[in-house]
A protein has these predicted regions:
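Aromatic-rich carbohydrate-recognition surfaces in CAZymes
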Residues: 47-179, 205-208, 212
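Acidic surface patches and DE-rich sequence motifs
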Residues: 30-32, 179, 186, 251-253
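Catalytic cores of carbohydrate-active enzymes
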Residues: 87-88, 153, 157-173, 201-204, ...
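Active-site-adjacent structural elements in folded domains
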Residues: 36-45, 108-112, 193-205
């Protein structure tokens, strides 16, 4: 059951209660048979599982209901990319953008049941697992999810960083896919300072911040599990972003 908060400020208590109610209204049960909780992106048009939306919502809801984060991570782990498919933009280790459950008539953008065109869902997956570990996820559950997090980290370097410059960028591989693959995913959502629509490949500053968070999260998990090599490697990657790459990403404009 969700936590309840009572304060002397009735407005704050009412806002908290409304938030709990809204989360409950968007809560789904994964129909795969596991009956684990996940959260939809929004009603009525997005009443299904979206990677980015579910991960951020579950992260923010950790003080209320950590089981939601577990359900989201498990559901996304099962759908994690295994092969290279240009139409769905599936790639090994990539966390999907959206899925349509069996029985839902509307397909994804590219016509299949699952579409992977997201630059940020994959590092967010690792970030959420790291935060859930801090909130007391038991060792067995952590170890069950860890291989998926490591495959996500591998995607960030092998596929997310297409040109080896240290940034995660995106460029759609399907004509029907999303031109922009961050949270502003409308076709005209990303623009240069002069108003021109930015052309991919694009490396969004917030995605680089998520990458930093993912490396830090995996390093923290490595400390907990006694993995000194992982701690050193992920710590170095995070330090490199903080020392230079992330700063340049925030100020550079193509």
């Amino acid at each position: 059951s969700a936590q309840r908060v009572r304060t002397a400020d009735r407005g704050l208590s009412a806002a908290f209660d409304r938030s709990i109610s809204d989360i409950g209204a968007l809560r789904l049960h994964d129909p795969s048979g596991h009956r684990r909780p996940v959260i939809a992106a929004g009603a009525p048009w997005y009443m299904t599982l979206f990677g980015r939306d579910a991960l951020i919502s579950a992260y923010m809801a950790l003080p209320i209901d950590p089981t939601l984060a577990i359900g989201v991570l498990e559901a996304l782990a099962e759908l994690q990319g295994r092969d290279v498919d240009l139409m769905s933009e599936e790639e090994p280790g990539r966390i999907m953008h959206e899925t349509r459950y069996l029985g839902v008539e509307a397909p994804t953008l590219t016509g299949g049941s699952t579409y992977y065109g997201s630059a940020d869902a994959t590092p967010l997956f690792v970030m959420l697992l790291g935060e859930l570990s801090r909130w007391g996820l038991d060792d067995d559950a952590l170890r069950d999810l860890l291989p998926y997090a490591d495959r996500a980290l591998a995607w960030m370097q092998d596929y997310g960083d297409r040109d080896g410059d240290g940034y995660i960028e995106y460029l759609k591989t399907s004509e029907r896919g999303l031109s922009n693959q961050g949270w502003k995913d409308s076709a005209d959502g990303i623009r240069y300072r002069d108003g021109r629509i930015a052309e991919a490949p694009l490396a969004l500053c917030e995605v680089q911040a998520y990458a930093y968070g993912a490396y830090r999260a995996r390093a923290a998990i490595g400390v907990r599990l006694g993995e000194p090599e992982v701690v050193a490697r992920c710590g170095q990657l995070a330090d490199e972003l903080k020392a230079g790459r992330l700063v340049r990403a925030l100020i550079r404009e193509a």
